[in-house]
Amino acid sequence: MLIPKRTKYRKQHRPVRSGMSKGGNEINFGDFAIQSLAPAYVTNRQIEAARIAMTRYIKRGGRVWITIFPDRPLTKHPLGARMGSGKGAPEFWIANVRPGRVMFEIGGVSEDIAKEALRRAIDKLPMKCRIIAREGGDI
């Protein structure tokens, strides 16, 4: 699973989810990609589930690139804890994804296989997404 090797601080503020993505809006590596249409926090487990869904479908052909990284810790209090008593312990790592961000890219496979693999990965993600091609536009 994806987590940072080390961070300067153990706990951080929650990131801002408003606004469009400032970078990472274009396909850089593959031929087809998943682009987010809504803001969301994507956890390291969701990224891993989407990666496994894609790689199992394409089998040995093609290549998958993950262009987001969960670099922010999200904290939670234990269940049944009373209010107060400080900030909770880091529970999981998230990537702050804004609308327009390209999250996964795929290359080296036909359009039909890429489309189905990316559709399976979209089912694992917590927001609305679309599949785009390098030539331009939706598929």
From Swiss-Prot:
PROSITE patterns attached to this UniProt entry: RIBOSOMAL_L16_2
GO biological process terms held by the UniProt record: translation
InterPro entries documented for this protein: Ribosomal_uL16, Ribosomal_uL16_bact-type, Ribosomal_uL16_CS, Ribosomal_uL16_dom, Ribosomal_uL16_sf
Positions of the UniProt region annotated as Disordered: 1-22
GO molecular function terms noted in the UniProt entry: rRNA binding; structural constituent of ribosome; tRNA binding
SUPFAM superfamilies reported for this sequence: Ribosomal protein L16p/L10e
Regions of compositional bias (Basic residues) in chain numbering: 1-16
Cellular component, GO annotation: cytosolic large ribosomal subunit
Keywords: Ribonucleoprotein, Ribosomal protein, RNA-binding, rRNA-binding, tRNA-binding
RNA-binding recorded as keyword: yes
A Pfam entry, by short name: Ribosomal_L16
Similarity-based family: Belongs to the universal ribosomal protein uL16 family.
Function noted in UniProt: Binds 23S rRNA and is also seen to make contacts with the A and possibly P site tRNAs.
Subunit and interaction comment: Part of the 50S ribosomal subunit.
Protein name as catalogued: Large ribosomal subunit protein uL16
Organism: Bifidobacterium longum (strain NCC 2705)
